[in-house]
Design a protein with these regions (language model features):
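C-terminal structural segments of small proteins and small subunits
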Residues: 83-106
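Winged helix-turn-helix DNA-binding recognition segment
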Residues: 77, 81
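Short alpha-helix boundary/capping elements
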Residues: 55-61, 90-94
């Protein structure tokens, strides 16, 4: 049985950390990004997760990469696919981005074993 795709608008630790500073940004993230954009029918949540992980790796956004890697796994992206994504993008976004992403992803994978 495949996992139920997730785009939970529930508070995340990252969003909670800055909610008091940018409450409107968090509100827009939860209502528009996760409540609307992620719910559009044109792409599956799995595909959106794969695209988002790729974009975050390419833009060198390790803080956001962790949470979206967890979401991608919950949405059915496999560990092998994430590894292939990192390897493939190394040639387009650079070796440093790929190596940093690999470290973040390794932490996520290890956290799921516990």
């Amino acid at each position: 049985m495949s996992p139920t795709p997730t785009t939970s608008t529930n508070a995340s630790p990252a969003r909670d950390e800055v909610r008091g500073v940018v409450p409107k940004l968090i509100d827009l993230s939860e209502k528009v990004l996760f409540g609307d954009v992620w719910e559009r029918p044109g792409l599956s949540k799995r595909d959106r997760s794969l695209i988002t992980v790729a974009a975050l790796m390419a833009m060198y956004r390790p803080e956001q990469l962790k949470g979206h890697t967890e979401r991608a796994l919950a949405n059915g992206v496999t560990k092998d696919e994430i590894g292939e994504l990192i390897t493939h993008l190394a040639f387009y976004s650079g070796w440093p981005s790929a190596m940093s992403a690999a470290k973040v992803v390794k932490q996520v994978f290890e956290g799921r074993k516990a």
